[in-house]
């Protein structure tokens, strides 16, 4: 511990990059039991990172919920518009996906352990390539991340979680 008046500067804390998977965005933009935890997770630390895969999966989840009549088309459009507005405001950092990410994902899948779904392998490859910690609500994805020794935080609903807010209008993450 540096004493007052010493010439030593306090060490700056490095900001950890956080890669946000689709399950967290769904909980954030739609009313779900994990909505409040997703909001806290997104606000913690620096600018959260996403990939084009997250953008595509988010739109796909909304479309699936509309087809299953779990979500009104107007609500899906509103969630998508708000997500896009947040992107335009710079509230997310976009991590591009390149050939090296596909190669790494393929190597992990070809190793047969841990069990990996195709798109999960790609999410993990993007996170690993950026040196990012994964924030997810997907238990299987979190298990795979930990098996690959990647930093990961799993959002879980606690016993008392009944809030299902969603579609927040926030000023900043």
Which positions does each model-derived feature cover?
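Active-site neighborhoods of divalent-metal-dependent phosphate/nucleic-acid chemistry enzymes
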Residues: 89-140, 146, 169-173
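Short gly/pro/ser/thr-enriched loop/turn and capping motifs at secondary-structure boundaries
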Residues: 58, 142-143
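Active-site-proximal, substrate-binding regions of enzyme catalytic domains
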Residues: 56-112
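Short, well-structured N-terminal submotif of metal-dependent ribonuclease cores
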Residues: 2-56, 61, 65-81, 148-150, ...
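Short acidic/polar capping segments at secondary-structure boundaries
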Residues: 139-141, 158-159
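Residue-level detector of short coil/turn "hinge" positions at structural boundaries
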Residues: 72-73, 116, 134, 152
């Amino acid at each position: 511990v540096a004493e007052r008046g010493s010439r030593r500067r306090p060490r700056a804390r490095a900001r950890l990059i956080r890669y946000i998977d689709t399950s967290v965005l769904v909980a954030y933009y739609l009313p779900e039991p994990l909505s409040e935890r997703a909001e806290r997770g997104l606000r913690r630390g620096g600018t959260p990172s996403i990939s084009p895969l997250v953008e595509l999966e988010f739109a796909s989840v909304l479309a699936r919920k509309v087809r299953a009549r779990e979500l009104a088309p107007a609500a899906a459009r509103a969630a998508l518009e708000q997500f896009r507005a947040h992107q335009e405001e710079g509230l997310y950092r976009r991590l591009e996906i390149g050939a090296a990410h596909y190669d790494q994902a393929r190597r992990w899948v070809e190793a047969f352990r841990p069990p990996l779904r195709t798109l999960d392998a790609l999410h993990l490859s993007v996170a690993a390539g950026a040196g990012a910690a994964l924030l997810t609500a997907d238990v299987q994805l979190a298990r795979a991340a930990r098996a690959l020794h990647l930093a990961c935080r799993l959002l879980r609903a606690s016993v008392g979680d009944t809030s299902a807010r969603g579609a927040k209008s926030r000023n900043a993450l």
